[in-house]
Amino acid sequence: MDTLIDKMKIPPSLLGKLNETNINKSTNSELRNSLEKDGYLFLRNIINPNEIEAARNDVFKRLNEVNELKEPYKDGISSGKSNRDKMCDNRGDFWESVSSIKSLRQVTNGKILENVFSKIFGSPSIGFDFIFLRAVAGGKFTHMHCDAGFFTRVTKQIFTCWVAFTEVTFDKGPLFVIEGSHKFKDVQDKYVDFDVDIHKDKKATIDTHPIQYAEERNSKILTAEFKPGDALIFGMYTVHGTFENHAKDNKIRLTCDIRFQPKSEPKDPRYFGLKPLGTTGAGYGELNSARPLNEDWHSR
């Protein structure tokens, strides 16, 4: 099964496998050492399958209600149509309501992930209230970038957790990371003081195609086929993106990004509270997923 980015096939010679970590057999220091060494932790089946299924079905039901999924909606097949704008006055309000589904929050802000990050930090952790739920239809992918410019305004002690709610085979656009990128000095120098909301003349997106980027750095593009309940954790300078969803069965990819930090660290008010306003202050309306499934995405 091919991996594509912007319709371009990734040469198999450039692809590598993500190293798996068994969190139940790892000490806190071993988890931190793996993050330091690889720039990520790949955790299989970390979330209870029943919790994942419940959240997925609840999200899919909402997408079906705006005519974006075919029946049976639990299969997650895109209809290629949408009544989202006809039925909802505000895209941001709609996506905020989807992102607030109780079964979803039991996963994203539940005890399992909180405990994982408490082990990583060596102290109690807390997840952002503002989450990045992504429903990804055919032809879409996330451009390569690192997260520092979005989330490190108040504290540098932030990690991203990417959770799969559907089967994410190679044709459905799994996450990838550039091998060793968390140690690329030029990346750290460029993004250490960058804030995408303040420095509007710059972009967080790395314009170089991942194929060229990996070749120039003699690196690999690391990925895997993800199962529901799998998670990938990585730091703010790990260069990553997603492959293109080009699945012939028209099934969407449902994943979610959650950020965690130590509870003792100061909190960025953009991402915490009852109604956080997100990176730019536009709330959930700023997210690509606030757009109907059949509409193109932006990049920043």
What do the predicted segments below correspond to?
Residues 2-20, 65, 69-73, 189-193, ...:
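Non-heme Fe(II)/2-oxoglutarate
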Residues 2-37, 44-144, 150:
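Non-heme Fe(II)-dependent double-stranded beta-helix
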Residues 62-66, 123, 168, 184, ...:
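Phosphate/oxyanion-binding loops and surfaces in catalytic or ligand/nucleic-acid-binding neighborhoods
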Residues 113, 122, 146-158, 219, ...:
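A short beta-loop-beta micro-motif enriched in histidine and acidic residues
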Residues 123-126, 148, 153, 163-174, ...:
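Active-site region of the double-stranded beta-helix
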Residues 136, 178-185, 257-265:
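Short edge-strand/loop segments of extracellular domains
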Residues 152-170, 225-228, 233, 259-263:
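Short, conserved beta-strand element in jelly-roll/cupin
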Residues 170-239:
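Double-stranded beta-helix
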